Amino acid sequence: MNLNKMYGLFLRHFYLIKSSLPRVLDLIYWPTIQIILWGFISKFFSIYSDYYNNTLGIILTCAILYDILFRSSISFNMLFLEEIWSRNFTNLFIAPLKLKEIIISLIFTALIRTLIGLVPAIILTSPLFGVSILKLGHPLLILFLSLYIFGITLGLFVSSGLMRFGPSFENIAWSSLFLLAPLGCIYYPIEILPEFFQVIAKGLPLVYIFDETRNILINGLVDYENIKQAYLLNLVYLIFGIGLFYLSFLRARVKGTLINMGE
C-alpha cells in the first residue's frame, strides 16, 4: 500500500469539505438536530406523561402528516435535481417554457409522487397499529393542503439556492426539512420549547397545523383559527418563495450558473 496515494485522496476530500460551507454544515447538522429534536420529545414526555390518552395514534398520525411535508418538498427538489444530474438543466430553460409553467408542472408532479409514497404507508398503519389518519375527518384535507403548500414553498427555496449556488447546495435539499422538525412542534406543544425558540416557531405554519391535529384527536374539536393562521403564513412564504425563485433564475442566467450546472 502506498501511503502517499492514500494521503493524496484524503486531502482531495478534505479540501472539498473545507472549501464548501454547505458540506461543513451538513456534517454538524445531523447530530445536532437529532439531539435537539429527541431532547424536546423526551422533555415533553417527562413533564406531561399523561398528556395523551392515545399516544401511539397521535404520534403516528403526526408522523404521517409530517411525511406529507417531507415528501412534497423532497419530490419538488428531486425533480429539479434530476434535471441537473441528467445534464438536462440547460435544455430545460432553452425549451419554449415559461418559468411559471415549469413551476406549475413541478408542483403537480410532486403531488403525484407524494401520494404514491404516502398511500401505502397510510393503508399499512391501520392493520399493523390500529391507527387511521382518516379519524381526523374532513379537516384532514385542509391540513394536507396546508402541509403540501408549505412543502412546495420549501422546495422553491431550495431550488432557488441550487440555481444561485450550484450543486454544492444539494445537501441543503436533504437537510432543510429536518432543521424545521424541532421548531415545528410535530410531536409536542409549543410550550416545550424555550421562550426564544417559541418566538421563532410561531412564525412557522407547522406549529399551527400540528397543534390543530392534536386538538382534533384529543378533544374532537376543530379550531379554525389555527388553520387560518397556518394558511396566512403559507401564503406569505409561498409568495416570497416564488419571488426568490424568479430572482435566483435571473441572477443565474446573468452569471452563467445555469449553463455550468447543465454541463
Segments from the language model and where they lie:
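Hydrophobic transmembrane alpha-helices and immediately adjacent juxtamembrane helices
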Residues: M1-E263
